């Protein structure tokens, strides 16, 4: 999954694995991107047995994986293709080596319009019984769009005693 920060790439990957009968391994490739991680963690997981029909490896922020590690990952994808699927997320898919990228189905998570985001945030605030003024909601959406995560976090940050209070945003 490709897209800007806060687009929902990681959330979508986690939703997928939770709704499939599978074992899965999650790795944040920003922190764990070395050859050793690919060989020891990913390789060991892919090679291990399972009672489930499928195994999935989520490599979050895969565009941070070192180039040499990408080659190892490519080999694992080919070796374990019958039992293991790989979900790669990242902001910059062009950083992946071409042979790896060509083996992936790319989904670009483009942000919805500001209007759709504002409507969704309004629904969340209503369900959480948080009072708000439309101009305040519009201010938050305009300031942090298209980063949905930042919009939600700032709504939480500026909620005091059940009301969205911006003050000096």
Describe the function of each predicted region.
Residues 147:
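Short, conserved phosphate/pyrophosphate- and ester-handling motifs at nucleotide-, phospho-/glycolipid
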Residues 159:
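Active-site-proximal segments of catalytic enzyme domains
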Residues 110:
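A Lys-centered signature of the CheY-like receiver
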Residues 1-107, 115-122, 126, 134-142, ...:
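P-loop/Walker A NTP-binding region and its immediately flanking N-terminal helices
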């Amino acid at each position: 999954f490709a897209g800007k920060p806060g687009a929902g790439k990681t959330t979508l990957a986690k939703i997928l694995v939770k709704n499939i009968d599978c074992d899965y391994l999650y790795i944040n490739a920003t922190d764990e991107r070395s050859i050793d991680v690919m060989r020891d963690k990913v390789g060991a997981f892919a090679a291990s047995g399972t009672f489930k029909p499928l195994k999935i490896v989520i490599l979050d922020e895969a565009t941070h994986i070192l180039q040499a590690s990408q080659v190892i990952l490519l080999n694992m994808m080919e070796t374990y293709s019958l039992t293991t699927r790989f979900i790669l997320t990242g902001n910059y898919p062009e950083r992946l080596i071409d042979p790896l990228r060509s083996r992936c189905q790319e989904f670009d998570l483009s942000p919805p319009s500001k209007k759709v985001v504002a409507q969704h945030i309004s629904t969340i605030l209503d369900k959480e019984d948080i009072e708000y003024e439309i101009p305040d909601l519009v201010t938050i959406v305009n300031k942090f769009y298209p980063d949905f995560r930042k919009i939600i976090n700032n709504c939480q940050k500026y909620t005091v005693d059940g009301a969205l209070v911006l003050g000096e945003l």
